[in-house]
Structure formats: structure tokens, C-alpha cells
């Protein structure tokens, strides 16, 4: 969708909602850009689980999600994080609406092929009609990373993956994956650009590690599936690391 920008907010969403962030959103809207936000909430989910004495377990960067964890995840994402984000926009008189998989089956999903993860899923389809209708009315959409499968099970979805699937389905002009670092680092230097076919090599070299591994895998998917520009950064106002499809020039 021409002129559409997707932004994935970090796990501590409030860290991203700075005045500079909102000024960039306002500038984009003035330039007739359509904005979609996908938010995480890992920090808040972990905090709530600990307060309820529910064990926190992760595997390969993904939260192991049993029934209790799933209920907490839904409660926090839909009932705490998303309203905080939409309220921040409303305070600035920016039209916004929060969406989740319960809204017309927005994000269809299926279980990941790992029974040890529990109710963790992957997006199989993004129903773009509702998103596009709202964007046509200049309403920013804020989407929670939860999916529903054919049996109507709710599934926890990695927020980076969800953002990349949404951006790809919309054929977005740009995707910004906001995180807590200003880009992908090699030593102390930010790498300006990474081609998708360089990612595995950088991973083996130890340049890419930890939570950056699944983030780059998601970014590569978006770059290879029609998203015009994919950037990993800590702010909409910094250049970060651009993920480019195929082989980098030079």
C-alpha cells in the first residue's frame, strides 16, 4: 500500500513514545503517509507474571506460553499496553484505534512447530481490509501481536514477526523496528546496511546474537517480501541499520 509506514514499538513501549516520536508521526501524516503501529509488551508481561508468581520461561528468544501465561499476555497487551499507547495519541489529538485478533479475525495464525513453546504462533494471514479502511480515513491503527487459529485458539506471536507480516501484507513503503539499541552493532560501530544474504554469515561470526537474531530474521522476511525499506533503530529520527534485499552493492 503506497505511502504506508509500519512501526514496531519496543517491548518497553513507553520508551518509544517521546515528543520526537510524535513529531515524526505528525510530519508523516502531513505528507499523507498512512501509519500502522504494532506493539510488543514483553517487559510488562514479565512484570505482571512475576507479581502473580507465574514462572517466566523463554526458549530461543520466545516466551514459553502455557494457558496461564497466555491469559496474562492477552490481559497486558490488550488491557494495559495498547490503551496506554492509544491514550498517548489521543492526548495529542491524533486519531487512533487499537486492534487485535478478536477484531474480525485480523491476524490469522497457527501453532509454531515446537510443542515445547505452548500457545505460541506464527501469522498465516493478515486481513488487511479493516486496516486499509481505517488508514483511508487517516486513522492510525495500533495492533497487538496476538493471533487466532482455525480452532479459535489465541496464540502469542513475536511482535517483530507480527510487524513484518503486517508490513508485508500491506506492501508498506517502510518498516521501522524500534528496539533499545540504535542499530545492529559490530563492535562499537553501527552497521549502516546489511543485505539479507549476509545475515547468516554475521550470525556465525558472532556479530549478530541474542534477541537480534530473530529480529533480523523477521526484518529479512519483510525486505524479501515487498516492503520498500526496513530499518532497525531506537528512534524514528536516527538512521539505524537498513536491511536490504539480497546482495549489498560494494
From Swiss-Prot:
Class of the enzyme per the UniProt entry, highest EC level: transferase
Family, similarity comment: Belongs to the acetylglutamate kinase family. ArgB subfamily.
Recorded metabolic or biological pathway in which this protein acts: Amino-acid biosynthesis; L-arginine biosynthesis; N(2)-acetyl-L-ornithine from L-glutamate: step 2/4
Name of encoding gene: argB
UniProt name for this protein: Acetylglutamate kinase
Swiss-Prot/TrEMBL keywords: Amino-acid biosynthesis, Arginine biosynthesis, ATP-binding, Cytoplasm, Kinase, Nucleotide-binding, Transferase
Site (Transition state stabilizer): 8, 215
GO biological process, one term: L-arginine biosynthetic process
Domain of life of the organism encoding this protein: Bacteria
Binding site for substrate: 41-42, 63, 156
InterPro entries: AceGlu_kinase-like_sf, AcgluKinase_fam, ArgB, Asp/Glu/Uridylate_kinase
Amino acid at each position: 500500500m503506497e505511502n504506508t509506514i509500519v512501526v514496531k514499538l519496543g517491548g518497553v513501549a513507553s520508551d518509544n513514545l517521546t515528543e520526537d516520536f510524535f513529531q515524526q508521526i505528525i510530519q508523516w501524516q502531513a505528507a499523507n503517509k498512512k501509519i500502522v503501529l504494532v506493539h510488543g509488551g514483553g517487559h510488562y508481561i514479565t512484570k505482571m507474571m512475576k507479581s502473580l508468581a507465574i514462572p517466566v520461561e523463554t526458549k530461543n528468544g520466545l516466551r514459553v506460553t502455557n494457558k496461564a501465561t497466555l491469559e496474562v499476555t492477552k490481559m497486558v497487551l490488550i488491557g494495559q499496553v495498547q490503551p496506554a499507547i492509544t491514550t498517548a495519541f489521543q492526548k495529542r489529538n491524533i486519531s487512533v484505534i487499537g486492534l487485535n485478533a478478536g477484531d474480525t479475525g485480523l491476524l490469522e495464525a497457527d501453532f509454531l512447530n515446537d510443542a515445547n513453546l505452548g500457545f505460541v504462533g506464527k501469522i498465516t494471514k493478515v486481513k488487511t481490509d479493516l486496516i486499509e479502511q481505517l488508514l483511508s480515513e487517516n486513522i492510525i491503527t495500533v495492533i497487538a501481536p496476538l493471533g487466532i487459529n482455525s480452532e479459535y485458539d489465541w496464540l502469542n506471536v513475536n511482535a517483530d514477526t507480527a510487524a513484518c507480516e503486517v508490513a508485508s501484507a500491506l506492501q508498506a513503503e517502510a518498516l521501522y523496528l524500534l528496539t533499545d539499541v540504535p542499530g545492529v552493532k559490530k563492535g562499537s560501530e553501527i552497521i549502516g546496511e546489511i543485505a539479507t544474504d549476509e545475515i547468516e554469515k554475521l550470525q556465525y561470526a558472532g556479530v549478530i546474537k541474542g534477541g537480534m537474531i530473530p529480529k533480523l530474521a523477521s526484518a529479512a522476511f519483510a525486505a524479501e517480501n515487498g516492503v520498500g525499506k526496513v530499518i532497525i533503530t531506537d528512534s524514528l529520527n536516527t538512521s539505524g541499520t537498513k536491511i536490504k534485499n539480497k546482495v549489498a552493492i560494494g
